[in-house]
Amino acid sequence: MGQDNSTPISLTLNHWRDVRTRAHNLSVEIKKGKWQTFCSSEWPTFGVGWPPEGTFNLSVIFAVKKIVFQENGGHPDQVPYIVVWQDLAQNPPPWVPASAKVAVVSDTRRPVAGRPSAPPRPPIYPATDDLLLLSEPTPPPYPAALPPPLAPQAIGPPSGQMPDSSDPEGPAAGTRSRRARSPADNSGPDSTVILPLRAIGPPAEPNGLVPLQYWPFSSADLYNWKSNHPSFSENPAGLTGLLESLMFSHQPTWDDCQQLLQILFTTEERERILLEARKNVLGDNGAPTQLENLINEAFPLNRPHWDYNTAAGRERLLVYRRTLVAGLKGAARRPTNLAKVREVLQGPAEPPSVFLERLMEAYRRYTPFDPSSEGQQAAVAMAFIGQSAPDIKKKLQRLEGLQDYSLQDLVKEAEKVYHKRETEEERQEREKKEAEEKERRRDRPKKKNLTKILAAVVSREGSTGRQTGNLSNQAKKTPRDGRPPLDKDQCAYCKEKGHWARECPRKKHVREAKVLALDNXGSQGSDPLPEPRVTLTVEGTPIEFLVDTGAEHSVLTQPMGKVGSRRTVVEGATGSKVYPWTTKRLLKIGHKQVTHSFLVIPECPAPLLGRDLLTKLKAQIQFSAEGPQVTWGERPTMCLVLNLEEEYRLHEKPVPSSIDPSWLQLFPTVWAERAGMGLANQVPPVVVELRSGASPVAVRQYPMSKEAREGIRPHIQKFLDLGVLVPCRSPWNTPLLPVKKPGTNDYRPVQDLREINKRVQDIHPTVPNPYNLLSSLPPSYTWYSVLDLKDAFFCLRLHPNSQPLFAFEWKDPEKGNTGQLTWTRLPQGFKNSPTLFDEALHRDLAPFRALNPQVVLLQYVDDLLVAAPTYEDCKKGTQKLLQELSKLGYRVSAKKAQLCQREVTYLGYLLKEGKRWLTPARKATVMKIPVPTTPRQVREFLGTAGFCRLWIPGFASLAAPLYPLTKESIPFIWTEEHQQAFDHIKKALLSAPALALPDLTKPFTLYIDERAGVARGVLTQTLGPWRRPVAYLSKKLDPVASGWPTCLKAVAAVALLLKDADKLTLGQNVTVIASHSLESIVRQPPDRWMTNARMTHYQSLLLNERVSFAPPAVLNPATLLPVESEATPVHRCSEILAEETGTRRDLEDQPLPGVPTWYTDGSSFITEGKRRAGAPIVDGKRTVWASSLPEGTSAQKAELVALTQALRLAEGKNINIYTDSRYAFATAHIHGAIYKQRGLLTSAGKDIKNKEEILALLEAIHLPRRVAIIHCPGHQRGSNPVATGNRRADEAAKQAALSTRVLAGTTKPQEPIEPAQEKTRPRELTPDRGKEFIKRLHQLTHLGPEKLLQLVNRTSLLIPNLQSAVREVTSQCQACAMTNAVTTYRETGKRQRGDRPGVYWEVDFTEIKPGRYGNKYLLVFIDTFSGWVEAFPTKTETALIVCKKILEEILPRFGIPKVLGSDNGPAFVAQVSQGLATQLGINWKLHCAYRPQSSGQVERMNRTIKETLTKLALETGGKDWVTLLPLALLRARNTPGRFGLTPYEILYGGPPPILESGETLGPDDRFLPVLFTHLKALEIVRTQIWDQIKEVYKPGTVTIPHPFQVGDQVLVRRHRPSSLEPRWKGPYLVLLTTPTAVKVDGIAAWVHASHLKPAPPSAPDESWELEKTDHPLKLRIRRRRDESAK
């Protein structure tokens, strides 16, 4: 080893593949990085002489191994590595140098001298023999320890000594009696491993086995293994590697394996491991077996009685361990999830080697592949390249010969790029240099231009004072005017010396005018004005800023802290430069605090206060004589804003605060203005239950304007400060909507929880109905207190599990909030919030109601009303209620409280003296509503006014004209009638009276009146002699009841208004008073006007013990309304109903004597796909009238037509008319009048069927002088005249339906048909003229042969050979041939099938709605011989899927098919599919396009599977068709087919094992003859079945299925014709033919014969063409003659 400078660690790394293979042979897993770390860094620190370069010295290896395996402070993760080191030293491979091998041998034979061991210390605790094995039972008894061996055996190192039985080690050393021992107490290196089964002496026989003794695992080992490894579900590789190493190194027993399974795995994981292990039990042939006896023998679930001191016992234990490890690996396999692997991306600062380890770990966790195997190297390499950092990825993708690079080579290349990356400082320096260089390039042209300008100025200034001459003689220069130059101290004005001209006393000084100089002409000019400066505190430091409104950003000269990454280019007078921005800085201005980022410009003369900060501070600059002054904006004005539905509050007069300050002092903790937000302390957190199958929904936040975001920010911040909102991370998200409060610029946050409300379970709403809430308030209680709870919903806590449902996005960069927020209290907008709060508050206030019966407490969600008969009771009750609310944690709004008053406002009502009034604010709201212009505005008006309908008598009558305008489907036209109704409602609202509160101790009286289809009434109670109104009721009757007689409409009105009155009376006695004898009508109802169900409903409501009817009265309060004022006289309702029942008083239903008798009937049936109908009239001997009716006429309609025609033909006569139609009979006698009275409308307000025929019948019924319409049974066999006449009418109806004479209309009587009179003699044409006439007629109509023949027959022309001429003309029409469809009738042929199963398959894709795992296609294979079907769900419809299923499913189970049939889909014609067929020798037959009948068997199976899946989904309630597919296949494979055999029986020769199959054959030899007999019989049965089916499938005599021959001209069908495009194209020349398809010239694919038809013969003589001319109104028609004709 010393000659080649190689070390043991370098040798192992250079031959790492061999080392890893050796580790696999030892059933352990090692990694290269950890191998190097443990050898060079970890083991040298143990202090046993391990060198950093490694060693093969067994003494040192065993010393390290002892520390690794020790009980306390051991290293379980290093066990596989030291075991492999030991194996390398004991069994050195060839690449270990000879010197190392010699050193090993010499080292193993040389005893190591050790220090004498010190005498053992006395134990602290007494020795205990019982070992705690957790919850596992005691292991089976093992033989006692044998005496110490006389000579050392070859176990452990050769020089190691066997341990003395009196000196226990292993797990016993970890017990309390051995815990003080030190590993260093041993005299030499110890090779013993702490094993559950360890050798205790020499074998008893020379060639016997070494006896073993059981040493259980210690609790510390189990705890370390449990805590130092991740769970099996998170990372199966960790525990799998641990147990593999334990199985090899510790040799655990069956009990130890169960203990490890129980400690290290969960119940579900343990069951999965055991199940997978039992699947991997090997049989005698070395393959996994399914025999239960062999499985139980090799892998028992109960404790076996194995003797581990025998060879058989040890062999069984070895098999058990191997099987358990195989089950562990099988359970560790996870479904392939490559998406998780693709999510592993290299971090910005992550080394490539670490990234590769993470990537390979992801492959192990999320795929069943081994990333270190050779087969997966390419996939791992591609993932490593594709998921690396962008710069590394770019470099690796440009490598040449990338396919030849290994993973190690790729990591090396990636490391080069990684280490060449620039640091953050280098990057900033580079960016700075680039910015400077960019700035220099930009300023270079400017500097050039500036240089030119300066040069021009200098040259211009120099040329102004020069002369053209004397350029070289400077001494001779003189002024231009010839005056001598002045001396230095000479005055230019007076020429005296001693002063200058500006100081000359002789010069007259002119007073300068005070003007404002706009330029200073180069001088300093006037003194500048004082500049406005302010001092602000930035991060605690006062800084004086110069206010500069021209600066866009505020500037600091020093950063005063950290500088952010943001940079800005500043353009100045000397050029541009890049300057940084600071991070957020805190500014204090008086009581305000603002955070702001400043631009740092060191060259700036002073800090600047720019427009950005001035705007944020709302600064104001004022200029005065003292100088400019800067002031900061005041606080925003606060406005009170109400909801839209509470707009009436804007018109309410301010209620003077009646709260005595003593109330605020007595109860300081209940008022929201003082105590803050409340919290219900006795209500548990609310748990929101989701619907079954609900999945998280994330709705993106809507765009929000800056103004709106700034408006709702204070509200969000307030809730954050109070803890009502908290940050969160949730898969749920709903948008936040800023709603602007009307009349102000303030916004409030409203969360759109509609998607959440859809996915949350509904609960029954228990919120009281405000309509009848005040009914429980006694009128004698006239002292009231009204309390309004503040932030009511926020008083209830929301369970933490339900809080993520209500998350929303919120970003506030100034406060540092970015992400999601959610509510910790019950949110507003949640559909169940009112019900949940109402129930919680009701439960909390239940004790108060029980302890205070002297007051009445009404609760509507968060609005409370306390009522009492006296002031003292009201005051005491209010005080106790406030105390109770304070104790419960609720808060009351002091501003809205109304305490101990006689007049209060509650729920929009004014309560006073036991009555309720409409508040003036509500009236003002309705009065200020403008005239509606849209249907929605009409609905809003009716909704707002409808709230006050109890105070408006006859509201439904007043609003009736407006209801049609609420529909969006009709045009909105506002007429005078609508305006009057609109004004009348407002006028009635102004005069609304006071309504008395219902007194439940007194009876009620309900006055009813019905006018114009509207039920009106007034509910009253008596007060002395007066009747006080409680409520005015009105409602519109339904369309059916509106058509009844007046008496019956009164019954419907009573039933309708009694329902509304019950909401106020709460089930008290009610007396009904009307102007009709209602009780007699209800008890003896007419059977012709209403159905039994409706009458039963009315009787259940009205014939009640609490409802009584008073005698009819002429005057009642309901008639005081502004309608007809005439009094209705008292009448007899039975007489009026009798008069209004029929349409004709003398109409009889019994035959009249001595008058003619007619029989009518109607028939309707379907023939040739069309519904035909006919109607006749017979008199018993002959047909009076008969006609066919238009196609699609029903039998009921035909009956009405026949009866109407009979009545018309009998005009002015006496007649008996029989009909067997109950529909026609009832319409004539009863229903017709009812239909007409109600406007021929159904109960839903729609037109009834056969409306026109019913009106015609009602008109015709008055035409005869006397008439009797009698009903007779149909289809009678008797010989009486009625039965005979009915049968003749039925036969005549069928004959009339098949006739060609169609009744044009049914509203006018039909005259009897008279034979046509021959007026003129027909004219005969020659054959040529006749053919020309037919040709011209066909060009005008383009009719077919039959219709054209009928048309010609109606003319007065005689044409020879008419039929042949018509056929010839129609067959030669080119337009008809290109457009008309053709029906082909051919003999049914036989499809080609296989001669045995698995030979001929048909395959097809069918699309189904998306199912589980994204499967939305079904790939169906069907064996044409047996009908056996195979179906596979797929995500895509590709050729790879087809090939995969053929190779993996069809070939292994059925063999290589000879023929595959499919359509021309892309997945079947692809090169991959056809190439596979070629390689396997499969004849892949592609069917003709647009001919699904060619794949009829698989297409029919597609339909069968879909229908079966639909039925199974309806039966089981399941929605995933993938789960139901096996059941559908089971039904398809076991459904009898054409021969009465199922596909299963044809394929396997016997019935499916669904039912009990009789005796089973065992493995005993006695059953071999029986088994042989069964097999022989099976072969015979299957052969007979196959031969019979094969004989049936043989093709018969070959017939010509189509008439097309080679050389024919044919037309080909267009399968997708466009608008106004011919159905056929062509003509084409036939080139080749088969029995079913034709090959034509010009089309590449074969065309099925059903898609062809013969081309018409073209006219050989001439053709016409249409040409366009230059004139826009002219066209040129040109005739061209065929050249061949010439």
UniProtKB/Swiss-Prot annotation:
InterPro entries: Aspartic_peptidase_AS, DNA/RNA_pol_sf, G_retro_matrix, G_retro_matrix_sf, Gag_P30, Integrase_cat-core, MLVIN_C, Peptidase_A2_cat. A lipid is attached at residue 2 (N-myristoyl glycine). A zinc finger (HHCC-type) spans 1338-1376. Residues 137-151 have a biased composition (Pro residues). Belongs to the retroviral Pol polyprotein family. Gag polyprotein: Late-budding domains (L domains) are short sequence motifs essential for viral particle budding. They recruit proteins of the host ESCRT machinery (Endosomal Sorting Complex Required for Transport) or ESCRT-associated proteins. RNA-binding phosphoprotein p12 contains one L domain: a PPXY motif which potentially interacts with the WW domain 3 of NEDD4 E3 ubiquitin ligase. Matrix protein p15 contains one L domain: a PTAP/PSAP motif, which potentially interacts with the UEV domain of TSG101. This is Gag-Pol polyprotein. It comes from Gibbon ape leukemia virus.
